[in-house]
């Protein structure tokens, strides 16, 4: 099957582990989920035939859960427990680790300078964002008022883009979250945690941008 003309967001939802493949190629399937596979491949200089073949192989596996068919209230409950609560645990710990690494390894050329600042900014951004979703937008959607939520949803999508921009900066200062040879145990553990946080955040944003919000606006 040809996947090149399909949006990344749709492919991430319909093919098991496609999201992990896109992350491997640094393709944005959450905030940039509306771009086609062909466009994303061209932007990242990826051979379209190779990635199509990889997707075809992944598509042979059964999908764990098709969120496009799950009731919106259940999706919201899942987002809060699986992603919101997790981000609230992840980011404070990563900030502590970054503070230590930047202090202890200040004289190393590969130290991720500014990482603490950018993780703190992301933590503040997401804390405010998630609170607004939980207190305003999610109750509206659960009450069947999705059609009236155009304004709040637009704001949330803009904030998703802003979070994505901060993630790009974090990836830049960490050499795409790759520890240098001299990295200590804390440094390596922090980068593992950052990679996990980015994976979670991309899945989180994708589920909202590509499933929850469109279905809510359609009046479900």
UniProtKB/Swiss-Prot annotation:
Pfam families: Hemerythrin, ScdA_N. Keywords: Cytoplasm, Iron, Metal-binding, Stress response. One of its GO terms (molecular function) is metal ion binding. One of its GO terms (biological process) is response to nitrosative stress. GO terms for cellular component: cytoplasm. InterPro entries: FeS-repair_YftE, Hemerythrin-like, RIC_family. Its main location: cytoplasm. It is found in: Cytoplasm. It comes from the Bacteria. Homodimer. PANTHER family: IRON-SULFUR CLUSTER REPAIR PROTEIN YTFE. This is Iron-sulfur cluster repair protein YtfE. It comes from Salmonella schwarzengrund (strain CVM19633).
